[in-house]
Amino acid sequence: MDTASVTGGEHKGKEKTCRVCGEEVAAREDGKPFVACAECGFPVCKPCYEYERSEGTQCCPQCNTRYKRHKGCPRVEGDEDDGGDMDDFEEEFQIKSPTKQKPPHEPVNFDVYSENGEQPAQKWRPGGPALSSFTGSVAGKDLEQEREMEGGMEWKDRIDKWKTKQEKRGKLNRDDSDDDDDKNDDEYMLLAEARQPLWRKVPIPSSKINPYRIVIVLRLVVLCFFLKFRITTPAMDAVPLWLASVICELWFALSWILDQLPKWSPVTRETYLDRLALRYERDGEPCRLAPIDFFVSTVDPLKEPPIITANTVLSILAVDYPVDRVSCYVSDDGASMLLFDTLSETAEFARRWVPFCKKFTIEPRAPEFYFSQKIDYLKDKVQPTFVKERRAMKREYEEFKVRINALVAKAQKKPEEGWVMQDGTPWPGNNTRDHPGMIQVYLGSQGALDVEGSELPRLVYVSREKRPGYNHHKKAGAMNSLVRVSAVLTNAPFILNLDCDHYVNNSKAVREAMCFLMDKQLGKKLCYVQFPQRFDGIDRHDRYANRNTVFFDINMKGLDGIQGPVYVGTGTVFNRQALYGYDPPRPEKRPKMTCDCWPSWCCCCCCFGGGKRGKSHKNKKGGGGGEGGGLDEPRRGLLGFYKKRSKKDKLGGGAASLAGGKKGYRKHQRGFELEEIEEGLEGYDELERSSLMSQKSFEKRFGQSPVFIASTLVEDGGLPQGAAADPAALIKEAIHVISCGYEEKTEWGKEIGWIYGSVTEDILTGFKMHCRGWKSVYCTPARAAFKGSAPINLSDRLHQVLRWALGSVEIFMSRHCPLWYAYGGRLKWLERFAYTNTIVYPFTSIPLLAYCTIPAVCLLTGKFIIPTLNNLASIWFIALFLSIIATGVLELRWSGVSIEDWWRNEQFWVIGGVSAHLFAVFQGLLKVLGGVDTNFTVTSKAAADETDAFGELYLFKWTTLLVPPTTLIIINMVGIVAGVSDAVNNGYGSWGPLFGKLFFSFWVILHLYPFLKGLMGRQNRTPTIVVLWSILLASIFSLVWVRIDPFIPKPKGPVLKPCGVSC
């Protein structure tokens, strides 16, 4: 078909409408109409044409012909060489004329693009070209793709820095760099560096990983022969003991396989922050880094000290990231006036703390932990005013800390009439179980500047509404409320979730995450980036394995080589679209032959088939289930309606208030109503009409908030056009979306946001995302990204483990159990094994408790689980023991974990297994099957104690979790004494079985040694109550066993009957 004929025939009219998005097809720069497809002339606008080429099938929706590249448009893979590369290169990168026009922009308080009113920050599009900018409406229909790079700047410092790094890497000769003074050559070098990947995968060296895999296979073979030997050689004089031990060993083998297979191909990753800066943060241009919203959650400020929460917030506000792209939301689920006043003081102190951190680039940027460091703080500091300003800042922080302590002391005793705010009005949250929603914006509005006149990141206090009779779903419900509030106020495309006791230890942590999330290829497939948890304030020997190094440095790296690490509840950067239940984009295979390769008589068949292909392609990001499918289909039309609607009307509503009334937002007149949408259908074509009617399905899924629904359709982040015109109306809309009844009859907690149904909502939420096909990434920068506090006290540590295990049991008993959920989906098999291991590990406590009891029983009764310890049995036992040691040693070799950390992990696996995990199994069964709810308590976070750094370590707190391990220790000690005494007094036929029994008993006690040491505390004595309970249980067990004596056959003699003879 002739292109000219198409152009003249199809575009005689002055205006043509794009058949994809419904917008007008704009003319080209030379005034001629834009024709996307030269074969059929199907009307498609330039933005849709470029998006289809970069993200879609690259084919025309009507004739299925592959789109050819138009001059000035970015290249994609598969484009033919048209001989105009050099001209396009100069035109795309604009080396000669870097200037361009910027559209006017009016500053708005809650605008995520710009707050200075000078020029809007460029928006970033996930998965878009690496060096491109986008402007225009939020719908993406009017977006005009800009040039991939703008040249003409000197950037001398960056060039020198780049040359130095390249010389160190051996990629650049020093002589060449000295001679290369030409400006254009420097620019081309920067272009080449900026186009390099932002990250790379670093596999484990084969010299370390291959022996590890070989030993795993050998251990599996040895394990099979060992189990065969154990099953085929029963102990006839102790069948119950033998049967119990074999069942335990079979379970341990299955548990080991589930734990070992996901660690088959571990990987590590490294990032390139300099390339990120060259690509998205170039000097003299608006920053194009993606905005991010921080979420901090807290429940009880008396258990979670406000000074710790304040330090977390301060470290967020001082993060090394553009201030207009950072927002911090603090969720107060306890509606505490103490936290409200604390954040007010924190916002005031941040005006001095944030510029101090950025001026001297200090780390960490949490003042409590920065000033408590026992290091040379003058190292690498060259500013002469640093010492003086640091001394002044430390004094100001101490004064700030005293004010916070005064607030805490005041909050200890609540007045009878309730708390009263400074203006004399009663505090709305006096009743923590019945109060309205509250929102307060401290920073981020105009006028909230630091002492140097620079802007500060946004800081927002949020306390969701609570009413009797509603299930608030604890932390998961609070996080979902923050998702909705942030979407209404800022709507950043990424969300970083932190616990209140986890501060930002690496100010560049967000940039580390953006190296993955803003990557051209990987970013659009990622649901979250997970950072490892690191802790402060742990004793040097880590008695109770609080650091959990084995999990974070071994298991998580193994998962990163499959589909990604699990979500661990904090230190995670989420893709907002993944939280909304959308599927990741599905890569479609390009057809080997297109229409222009077939004869003309086949074109109609191809077009018919292409129609189906185009239809299926529209649902590229369908929801996770239920009504989630097809959410992308009405996106363009619905956004077009909001855009046209915003030109006529603005958001209504009165002035913003701190707290909504008892009916909250229900009386508030919203700007977009469903009735108005239905009335506005007249005059639209069929495509737009069907798109607008899908508003009802959106409300069933996301809730009845048109502003929030519109924000979910903006993939790039940012507020819908016109929504930011009235900040007061946005506050009222935000109060509406945190009302207690908002989630009724919606998909929140089921398919959207944090998933309900378990106290470990983190595991469930990550599992749902991976089932949809999303991937996650494990980021381990050299400097820990975040650090938190861990419960170093034995009782608190066991209660923490109890809560985790209880959540796993709840997931096991739910429909989301990995054993039977989402088969046929996009969850990889090894990833399913890993999730299965995370929910079945509490059940290991039952065979573990039995196996730790068997050695003592054998010593008390003189029986053994093995009939005869012959040479073959000895070989299998020794081979299994050596394979376990070899696996552990090689695992430490490739992971870098110390042997002490590995041994502490093994010890606490036994301690937690026979205590917290055991209780979690029974509590979980009672909760799920019997309906008996077990309320979990928040683990207390102790503030820093300068008098005794580890005073909490020796503090004893009574809990029933201490009884089973103590009983095991006493039983095994009694068994050792009884076994040795019996051998000495009565002799022993064979010392081999005796040594085997003694070895197993000592092995149990050795694993429980940290627990025993914790019971003794500082005074080296076990609490009386624990001793009494344990001795009582051990005595009852021993007496019953001796009385029954099940392994000694009853003597059967002749039956005596009266014979009638006197004898």
Swiss-Prot record:
ZnF endpoints (RING-type): 18-64
UniProt GO MF annotations: cellulose synthase (UDP-forming) activity; cellulose synthase activity; zinc ion binding
Gene3D superfamilies linked to this entry: Spore Coat Polysaccharide Biosynthesis Protein SpsA, Chain A, Zinc/RING finger domain, C3HC4 (zinc finger)
Positions bound to UDP-alpha-D-glucose: S297, K303, E304, D333, K474
Catalytic activity entry: [(1->4)-beta-D-glucosyl](n) + UDP-alpha-D-glucose = [(1->4)-beta-D-glucosyl](n+1) + UDP + H(+)
Species per Swiss-Prot/TrEMBL record: Oryza sativa subsp. japonica
InterPro entries: Cellulose_synth (IPR005150), CES_Znf_RING (IPR027934), Nucleotide-diphossugar_trans (IPR029044), Znf_RING (IPR001841), Znf_RING/FYVE/PHD (IPR013083)
PROSITE patterns, A to Z: ZF_RING_2
Ranges of Basic and acidic residues composition bias in the record: 141-154
Protein name as it appears in the record: Cellulose synthase A catalytic subunit 7 [UDP-forming]
Residue positions of the active site: D333, D762
